[in-house]
């Protein structure tokens, strides 16, 4: 996200270029009292102030999808903006200077803003922590602790890097925790859109509960174009029922599904929800009886909690 203040006006933009001021009025109001103009790159999180860690990412959706949240909602889902980088200050574009120098500027202004007692921003704004591993094994230790903090891993940045748009290789690197995985049975397919129009590319997967298959996740990414076309042909030949654009399928295909997080969910029949599910392998070597169960999913959840 980018948090911007220019000429007295504060705006909060998502990565998808959506203005979300109305969803987070407390942040906009607090930052409007800062006298400096700025452009900050960062992340918005629902924050556990007692433990000083993020709550699960899914809770942020309860704020983003709600305009003009009531005071009770703001208290129930308290947010914080964590600044990663300072891109502009008082009209001066500093994206071309080294990251380590931008960090010095960020820390200087954060200290200045924080010391304004009439506008304490510490309850809604902070800057990200820096870590300096002594070697790769040490970095691995930090990475593995990320899941305990409800984060996906580390971002490694060159100290002399500029701030640029797009995916620039060799400047910043995401060092993410290894995904969790379950083998699941394909039970539904839905037609794609855009370049994938005319092909079945959106899939739903199930896990066993006793002798019944219960849907637990949907995914649309991970297969190669050749695999998509091969699976599309199979889907058309093995449809049980049609529900508008959705087809119910013979339970014969097993896929390895990877995801970043698993948690209890009362909204789903399975009782669980996963974050960022995607297909990582078509398990043609497995029969549906080899697929994982909901019991396996709950065991996985206990292991990481």
Placement of each model-derived feature along the sequence:
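Catalytic cores of nucleic-acid ligases and guanylyltransferases
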Residues: 1-201, 206-305
């Amino acid at each position: 996200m980018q948090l911007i203040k220019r000429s007295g006006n504060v705006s909060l933009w998502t990565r998808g270029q959506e203005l979300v001021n109305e969803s987070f009025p407390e942040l906009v109001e607090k930052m409007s009292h800062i006298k400096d103009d700025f452009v900050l790159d960062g992340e918005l999180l629902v924050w556990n102030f007692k433990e000083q860690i993020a709550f699960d990412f899914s809770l942020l959706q309860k704020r983003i999808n709600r305009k003009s949240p009531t005071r009770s909602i703001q208290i129930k889902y308290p947010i914080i903006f964590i600044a990663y980088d300072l891109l502009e200050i008082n009209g001066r574009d500093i994206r071309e200077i080294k990251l380590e120098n931008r960090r010095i500027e960020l820390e200087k202004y954060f200290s200045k803003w924080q010391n304004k007692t009439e506008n304490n921003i510490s309850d809604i704004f902070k800057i990200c922590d820096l870590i300096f591993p002594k070697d790769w094994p040490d970095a691995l230790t930090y990475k593995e602790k990320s899941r305990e903090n409800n984060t996906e891993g580390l971002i490694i940045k060159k100290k002399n890097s500029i701030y640029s748009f797009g995916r620039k290789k060799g400047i910043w690197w995401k060092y993410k925790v290894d995904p969790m995985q379950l083998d699941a049975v394909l039970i539904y397919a839905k037609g794609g859109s855009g370049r994938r129009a005319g092909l079945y590319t959106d899939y739903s997967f199930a896990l066993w509960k006793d002798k019944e298959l219960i849907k637990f996740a949907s995914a649309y990414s991970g297969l190669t174009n050749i695999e998509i076309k091969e699976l599309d042909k199979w889907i058309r030949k093995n449809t049980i029922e049609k529900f508008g654009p959705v087809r119910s399928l013979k339970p014969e295909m097993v896929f390895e599904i990877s995801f970043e997080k698993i948690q209890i969910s009362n909204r789903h029949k399975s009782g669980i929800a996963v974050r960022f599910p995607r297909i990582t392998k078509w398990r043609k070597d497995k029969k549906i009886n080899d697929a994982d169960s909901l019991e396996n999913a709950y065991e996985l959840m206990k292991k990481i909690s």
